[in-house]
Amino acid sequence: DKCNKLVPLFYKTCPAGKNLCYKMFMVSDLTVPVKRGCIDVCPKNSALVKYVCCNTDRCN
């Protein structure tokens, strides 16, 4: 699987077991992701951050 890095022009091949792509947003600004990458399980959202996860190549 491949996931975008923070700058979507670049991407990385995910290590084994980390086959979800994610975008992390600050709840205060849901328009600009602050982090992107590969992850094994989608984290829970909190009061400060929101995660958006997906499972196809470069879907983040």
Curated annotation (Swiss-Prot):
Keyword flag Hydrolase: no
SUPFAM superfamilies noted in UniProt: Snake toxin-like (SSF57302)
Keyword Secreted: yes
Swiss-Prot/TrEMBL keywords: Cardiotoxin, Cytolysis, Disulfide bond, Membrane, Secreted, Target cell membrane, Target membrane, Toxin
Subcellular location: Secreted; Target cell membrane
A matching Pfam family: Toxin_cobra-type
Segments passing through the bilayer: none
Tissues expressed in: Expressed by the venom gland.
GO biological process, one term: killing of cells of another organism
Superkingdom in the source lineage: Eukaryota
Paired cysteines (S-S): 3-21, 14-38, 42-53, 54-59
InterPro entries: Cytotoxin_Cobra, Snake_3FTx, Snake_toxin-like_sf, Snake_toxin_con_site, Toxin_cobra-type
GO molecular function: toxin activity
GO cellular component: a single term: extracellular region
Summary of subunit composition and partner proteins: Monomer in solution; Homodimer and oligomer in the presence of negatively charged lipids forming a pore with a size ranging between 20 and 30 Angstroms.
Functional note: Shows cytolytic activity on many different cells by forming pore in lipid membranes. In vivo, increases heart rate or kills the animal by cardiac arrest. In addition, it binds to heparin with high affinity, interacts with Kv channel-interacting protein 1 (KCNIP1) in a calcium-independent manner, and binds to integrin alpha-V/beta-3 (ITGAV/ITGB3) with moderate affinity.
Family: Belongs to the three-finger toxin family. Short-chain subfamily. Type IA cytotoxin sub-subfamily.
Protein name: Cytotoxin KJC3
Species assigned in the record: Naja sputatrix
